[in-house]
Amino acid sequence: MQPEVEPVCFPAMGSPTMHRKAGALLMDLETPEEMQARSLGRPIKSSKQYLRQVIAEYEALDRELPCIRKFPTPPASQPLCLCMETLPEEDFTHLEVLQALEAQLPGAMESGRVSSIRFENMNVICGTAGRRNRWLIAVTDFQTRSRLLRSGLSPRGLAHQIVRHDDLLLGDYRLHLRRSLVRRRMLEALGAEPNEEA
């Protein structure tokens, strides 16, 4: 008797089982970098291109905005805080800013409509040079705030616009978030653990 020989059958190429097996074989051939790229949802072929793109984006942001104010938490709202931005070479004193306030609001401090005047050296805060400094003026009511927003201040006769400090802080915070996101993407692309900026 002749032994029975089982005929060789090839499953159809459209078989889901075959595709799963082929996928597993392809996965086994991937490098760890390619597997990480796949897990992060990036196309495998362009993982090096993606890394170059992220680094270029970070460098472009660095050139565009070399010194960004960092925030450990979102800034708290201060609706009654106003700000006058000045150039670094405009070396105003507190007395000059107070006199400019008094020109707009006679008896501003004595009447209690202005509670404080504070100087913020943005170049020291951001560790850079050439940024506009900020004079923060805290008022006690919305009527005074509206009046100063409309009129502005003119220390030494130089007209300066007054803006809401919250608007400036929100702009600073958005830049901080943008830079943090780009930095996180760069670290992930490099395979490093993203952590908080120092």
Swiss-Prot record:
Native source organism of the sequence: Homo sapiens
Pfam families, per the entry: DUF4732
InterPro entries: DUF4732
Protein name, as recorded: Putative uncharacterized protein C19orf81
Phylogenetic placement of the source organism: Eukaryota, Metazoa, Chordata, Craniata, Vertebrata
